[in-house]
UniProtKB/Swiss-Prot annotation:
Phylogenetic classification of the source organism: Bacteria, Bacillati, Cyanobacteriota, Cyanophyceae, Synechococcales
Keyword Ubl conjugation: no
Organism: Synechococcus sp. (strain RCC307)
Gene3D superfamilies for the chain: Metal-dependent hydrolases
Keywords: Hydrolase, Metal-binding, Pyrimidine biosynthesis, Zinc
Protein name: Dihydroorotase
Binding site for Zn(2+) 1: H17, H19, K103, D251
Pathway listed: Pyrimidine metabolism; UMP biosynthesis via de novo pathway; (S)-dihydroorotate from bicarbonate: step 3/3
Cofactor: Zn(2+)
Record note on cofactor: Binds 2 Zn(2+) ions per subunit.
Reaction(s) the record says it catalyses: (S)-dihydroorotate + H2O = N-carbamoyl-L-aspartate + H(+)
PANTHER family given in the database record: DIHYDROOROTASE (PTHR43137:SF1)
Length: 346
């Protein structure tokens, strides 16, 4: 038996789905993402949402201004699709290198998505243009019909919307973001090279029981919600399989502790500070360390047609206790009060 390594040196990873927020929260959470990742796809669901080239440029400038001295990090900006967004505005942003991709939020599916798309038919011209200019579409894949059980909303979205969309726009590059079900994983496996998916660390670690163990655990509440154990296991198999259609996307979504622990708690898990250590625990447990670099550092940029990072990071087998709360931030990190076996070296 090959002995377990004490150190891993990897091509620097990227995060293909992150919420950096804005203002004070941006300043608090950006260093954690920039420490672990060279680039990140930045979600546009601010208030107001990022729907124009000028808004994306301004947000990118705020991110760059908040970056601590000595840190190298590139934010990759996205456009927030609405029923009336202009195809010309999207094309201009993509041509000028401002918009890396466009994000489809079904209206009212998640945090700050009220201005999202009410019906895919409303954005047919937009999707036609995106397909023509080879601009990736990023999808929050859940239906919002109140008659559909919240645990079934991803699977129903595939049948109602994603399958027809792939048929109508077969040359459109699509990322099915933060997948949570075996149906989603299988849909991507069965798809073509223009279909990919991101997987979060928390959906690899927890199932829906975690939200209710020992009481109501608001820190494990996110959207899409965690599902049954069989879905978690299917995600672990997909992430660690070596299939290039799957890549890292944390969906790190910080909320102040007071916002999480309230009568109407916010959806989102803040996993950025220990994201790589969290993913690595899964790959090691599944006996798939040989596939970790591709998942974290190679599959994403290849799908987005971006260069691979040339610098490296080092992860060492050094146990670390994750704090119950991050000092001075009022944020509870994923794995709070747990011990992780790996540590990202400074």
């Amino acid at each position: 038996m090959t002995p377990a390594p004490d150190q891993l040196v990897l091509r620097r990873p990227d995060d293909w789905h992150v919420h950096l927020r804005d203002d004070v929260m941006l300043e608090q959470v950006l260093p954690a993402t920039a420490r672990q990742f060279a680039r990140a796809i930045v979600m546009p669901n601010l208030r107001p949402p990022v729907t124009t080239v000028d808004a994306a440029i301004a947000y990118r400038q705020r991110i760059e201004a908040a970056l601590p001295d000595g840190m190298a990090f590139t934010p990759l900006m996205t456009a927030y699709l609405t029923d009336d967004i202009s195809p010309d505005e999207l094309e201009r942003g993509h041509r000028e290198g401002v918009f890396t991709a466009a994000k489809l939020y079904p209206a009212n599916a998640t945090t700050n998505s009220a201005a999202g798309v009410s019906d895919l038919a409303c954005i047919t011209a937009v999707l036609e243009r995106m397909q023509a200019i080879d601009m990736p579409l990023l999808i929050h894949g859940e239906v919002t019909d109140p008659d559909i059980d919240i645990f079934d909303r991803e699977a129903v979205f595939i049948e109602r919307h994603l399958i027809p969309l792939r048929r109508q726009f077969p040359q459109l590059r699509v990322v099915f973001e933060h997948i949570t079900t075996e149906q989603a994983a299988q849909f991507v496996v069965d798809g073509d090279p223009l279909m990919a998916a991101t997987i979060t660390p928390h959906h690899l670690h927890i199932n829906r029981n975690a939200m209710f163990q020992g009481g109501l655990r608001s820190d494990f509440y996110c959207l899409p919600v965690a599902k049954r154990e069989r879905h978690r296991l299917a995600l672990r198999q997909a992430a660690t399989s070596g299939d290039p259609s799957f890549f890292l996307g944390t969906d790190s979504a910080p909320h102040p502790r007071a916002g999480k622990e309230s009568s109407c708690g916010c959806a989102g898990i803040y996993n950025a500070p220990y994201a790589l250590e969290s993913y690595l625990a899964v790959f090691e447990a599944e006996g798939a360390l040989q596939h970790f670099e591709a998942f974290a550092s190679e599959n994403g940029p290849r799908f987005y047609k971006l260069p691979l990072n040339e610098d490296t990071i080092t992860l060492k087998r050094t146990a670390q206790l994750v704090p119950a709360q991050l000092e001075g931030q009022g944020l509870v990190p994923f794995h709070a009060s747990e011990v992780l076996d790996w540590r990202l070296a400074d």
